[in-house]
UniProtKB/Swiss-Prot annotation:
Principal localisation: cytoplasm
Gene name per UniProt: Arhgef9
Source organism of this protein record: Mus musculus
GO cellular component: cell cortex; GABA-ergic synapse; postsynaptic density
SUPFAM superfamilies, per the entry: DBL homology domain (DH-domain), PH domain-like, SH3-domain
Protein name as catalogued: Rho guanine nucleotide exchange factor 9
Length: 516
């Protein structure tokens, strides 16, 4: 290490933990930051640089990149270093090596080393913290422990099985010949358990924050750490490890693929494993984003007048699409103009106020789990006795009930049909990984709405749809991307006939307050 630094080699390290400090000569960073190591003469404290900032930092808070090389400008996957002993407690650097097999061996050894260290962290959490907490019924309830630790024991059991299979595939004599790609593919479904843990992590942090205000809990958790002989990291740092770990797999596999020759027996398996793990992390991040947006859904529901039935969050967590259409509920029924909000599992129907177009009234909902979508060709419908254009139906598979919808334009109809397919796909994926909103998260969203109502006043709320992802293709440009604070009258204005307003109504609405 010292030879590399004094030899003008660029030695880079990645932060494994957040280092929060107020000291002038210490370097603050977050997990994932890349640090240029300038001095490693002290085994415990190194001197490093991030951008223009330099300072001391704990050596145990970082991991050295597997491969280091001179003059690197491409990032962590393009940096090279010497051999890594997977059984050691640190990464040992030697002279830069250009041999591709050696580079692959370095990455394999790093993967094995980090997996073994990760298993130890999980064991420390389960035995050092969770096991001790269960003994103190006077301090922790079962519900509290579920919030704080989530499904960490399930993750521990899964990782032990995963590492056992990795060890079987590891070639100790020639690490570059190891075939670990199939292990990721065989266990790909098991990695979805991280979704529940990541979704719960924010609740865990909030619960810990409340407990840590009491010195009893501070002393208890510190005693647990010392008893288990764990490194000097707070409990919230240990609980962050699984979240960081699942995000690291695509980075490690991408680096492994780079140093794997295409004629290597493991190449196609590593490539497939990289695609799988990227999809897992992408879906986990997407579901975490959805949970972060549930406050907006709760706020939107609170702004809709005359709400009836269960809350949106009881079944749904994402607004997929919204728009205004003509709707006929039953044969020979009257054509009605409604604003529709398609969530996962349900579609909510609302009616605009006749004068205040930014105010919505609740008019019902459709359970999408019971309905199928039927595309209808233009022409006459004998059942409803109407001429149809840009129409589609929702058919209840149990009761044979049918709803008929008319879009303004063909493009809008296509967007709705695509949205319905997306809704079904989302529901199936959520069921596959067991995604759901916890009762604690629902309570937090409700509290946020109540606080906002007290601050702004109930009458100031407007029926603005919650945000959702941007369009994926040109056809989706018709989606209503509504930032917070914009009234719906601005959003849906194009669907209303243009007419000038009488001065009488302008004066009336200004001078005569009344309750809707």
């Amino acid at each position: 290490m010292y030879d590399l630094i004094t030899g003008d080699s660029i030695v880079s390290a990645e932060a494994v933990w957040d280092h929060v400090t107020m000291a002038n000569r210490e370097l603050a960073f977050k997990a994932g930051d890349v640090i240029k190591v300038l001095d490693a003469s002290n085994k415990d404290w190194w001197w490093g640089q991030i951008d223009d900032e330099e300072g001391w930092f704990p050596a145990s808070f970082v991991r050295l990149w597997v491969n280091q090389e001179d003059g690197v400008e491409e990032g962590p996957s393009d940096v090279q270093n010497g051999h890594l002993d997977p059984n050691s407690d640190c990464l040992c650097l030697g002279r830069p090596l250009q041999n591709r097999d050696q580079m692959r061996a370095n990455v394999i050894n790093e993967i094995m080393s980090t997996e073994r260290h990760y298993i130890k962290h999980l064991k420390d959490i389960c035995e050092g913290y969770l096991k001790q907490c269960r003994k103190r019924r006077d301090m922790f309830s079962d519900e509290q422990l579920k919030v704080i630790f989530g499904n960490i024991e399930d993750i521990y059991r899964f990782q032990m099985g995963f590492v056992r299979d990795l060890e079987k595939q590891y070639n100790n004599d020639d690490p570059h010949l190891s075939e670990i790609g199939p292990c990721f593919l065989e266990h790909q479904d098991g990695f979805w358990i991280y979704s529940e843990y990541c979704n719960n992590h924010l609740d865990a942090c909030m619960e810990l924050s409340k407990l840590m205000k009491d010195s009893r809990y501070q002393h208890f958790f510190e005693a647990c750490r010392l008893l288990q002989q764990m490194i000097d990291i707070a409990i919230d740092g240990f609980l962050l490890t699984p979240v960081q770990k699942i995000c690291k797999y695509p980075l490690q596999l991408a680096e492994l693929l780079k140093y794997t020759a295409q004629d290597h027996s493991d190449y196609r398996y590593v490539a497939a494993a990289l695609a799988v793990m990227r999809n897992v992390t992408q879906q986990i991040n997407e579901r975490k984003r959805r949970l972060e947006n549930i406050d907006k859904i709760a706020q939107w529901q609170a702004s809709v007048l005359d709400w009836e039935g269960e809350d949106i969050l009881d079944r749904s967590s994402e607004l997929i699409y919204t728009g205004e259409m003509a709707w006929i509920y039953q044969p020979y029924g009257r054509n009605q103009q409604r604003v529709f909000f398609l969530f996962d599992h349900q579609m909510v129907l609302c009616k605009k106020d006749l004068i205040r177009r930014d105010i919505l009234y609740y008019k019902g909902r459709i359970d999408m789990d019971k309905y199928e979508v039927i595309d209808i060709e233009d022409g006459r419908d004998d059942d409803f006795n109407v001429s149809m254009k840009n129409a589609f139906k929702l058919h209840n598979k149990e009761t044979e009930e049918v709803h008929l919808f008319f879009a303004k334009k063909l493009e809008e109809k296509i967007r709705w049909l695509r949205a319905f397919r997306e809704e079904r796909k989302m529901v199936q994926e959520d069921e596959k990984i067991g995604f759901e909103i916890s009762e604690n998260q629902k309570r937090q969203a409700a509290m946020t709405v109540r606080k906002a109502s007290k601050q702004k006043g109930v009458n100031s709320a407007r029926s603005v749809p919650p945000s959702y992802p941007p369009p994926q293709d040109p056809l989706n440009q018709g989606q209503y991307l509504v930032p917070d604070g914009i009234a719906q009258s601005q959003v849906f204005e194009f669907t209303e006939p243009k007419r000038s307003q009488s001065p009488f109504w302008q004066n009336f609405s200004r001078l005569t307050p009344f309750k809707k």
